[in-house]
Amino acid sequence: MKITRIISILTLAAALLCSCQAQKPSFVRVEDGMFVCEDYPSHYVGTNFWYGAILGSEGVGGDRARLEAELDTLKALGMTNLRVLVGGDGPDGIPTRVSPTLQKEPGVYNDTIFRGLDYLLAEMAERNMKAVLYINNSWEWSGGYGMYLEWAGAGKALIPAEVGYQPFMESVSRFVTNEKAKELFYDHVRHVVSRTNTVTGKPYKDDPAIFSWQIGNEPRCFREDSEGQDAFVDFLWTTAALIKSLDPNHMVSSGSEGKWGCEGDMALYERIHSCPDIDYMNIHIWPYNWSWVRENTLKTNLPLAIANTDKYIDEHLALAQTYGKPLVMEEFGFPRDDFQFAQGTPVTARDEYYRHVFGRIVESAKEGGLFAGLNFWGWGGFAGQSETDLYWQPGDDYCGDPAQEQQGLNSVYVSDSSTMKVIRDATDAITEVLKK
C-alpha cells in the first residue's frame, strides 16, 4: 500500500475520532430566551408524574410493566417532558405522605427508590423524553421542609390534615432561617446530583434524559418580614449555585408557583429569578385552590378562571421577557364536573380549560415566544381506584393526586378520552408549527 494512501486513511480515522469526541449530549439549554436542543422542541406540552421513581422500583409500590405502558402512552400522545419527584423524605406510614420514601433519615436512603429513578430515566431516554427532577417540597406530602426541621431538632413535623394549614405554614416558615435544616438539605442535593445511574452507568450530570434540576415543589417563604424573605432568596440562590457547581450541564429551575407562592409579592419573585444560576421561570395555576371556581361554579365561573389565568401568565411573561428567560407553566389542574372523583365522570369544564391553556402555548410556538412549556397536573394514566378509600392508602395504585388529596381530584386517566384528544390536538399543533 502506498505511503500516501496509508497517511490518508490515518488522517480520515483521526478526523472521525475527533468528530465523535466533539459530539455533545443533547442537553437542553437557554439561548436568547428559548429552549435549545439538537433533538428536542423549543415548546412543549408535558405532565406531572410525581410517582415515576416509585413505579420504576423493584420494591414496594414498584410496577415496571405499568411504568413502561405509561411512558409509551405519554410518548404516543406527544408528551416528552415529565415533572418527577426525586423521592420523599422521612419514615413511611405517616398520614398524607407518599410512601415508600427515598430518604429515611438524613443521608440514609432506600436504594430501591433510587434504582427506580435510575430505571425511569433509562426508559425515558429510550423514548427521547426528559425529566424535570424536583428535590424538595414546601408541603407535607413528601416530607420536605417539615421533615428537615424535625431532623434539625426543631420539633415534630406537623400534618395539615391534623392541625390545619395555618399552623402548618407557620411551622415550616422556620425552614429558611434554620441553618442546620438547610445544611441537611444541601447534603441531600450533593448526594442526588452526584449520583451515577445503576442502569446505564452514566452519571446524572452526563444524562441528557434530565431536562432540569428543580430546587423544590412550590418553594415558599411563608413569611412577609424582610429577614425571612432575604433568607428565602439566599436559600434559593445558594441551592441553585450548589447544583450548578456539581452539574454544569443541566439547567436549574426554582419550582415556584409565581407571585402566588411569593406572598403575592412580584418583587420577591423577581429577586429569586434574577439569579444567574436559575435558567428559566416557573408558574403554577390552580383555579379551584385559589377560589376562582368552587365546587358548584366549575362551569359558571370557568370564564373567570380563564381570564385570571391569562392575566397571571401575562404578568409573569412580562418579567420573563425582561430577563430573557423562558416561562413554563409546570402545574395546573381543574376538577371533574360537579366535583366528582370517579373515573368515567364528565370532564367538560376541565377540557375547555385545558384547551384554552394549550392554545396559549401553540400561539407562543407560532410567535417564537418565551411562553415555552406546560405540564398539567397530573397524570393518572392506567391507575385503578379504590372502591373504599377516598384518600390513598398503602397498596392503592398511584395516580396524579398525592396522598393528601382525594384520589381522582385532578388526575387525568387514559379513560378520559375527550381529554386525550385535547392533549393530542395540542401536541400535534405544536409539532406542525415547529416543522415550519
Region roles according to the model:
Residues 3, 19-21, 212:
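Intrinsically disordered, low-complexity regions enriched for glutamine and histidine
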Residues 1-10:
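Bacterial N-terminal signal peptides that target proteins for export
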Residues 296:
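Amphipathic helical hotspot of TIR/SEFIR-family domains
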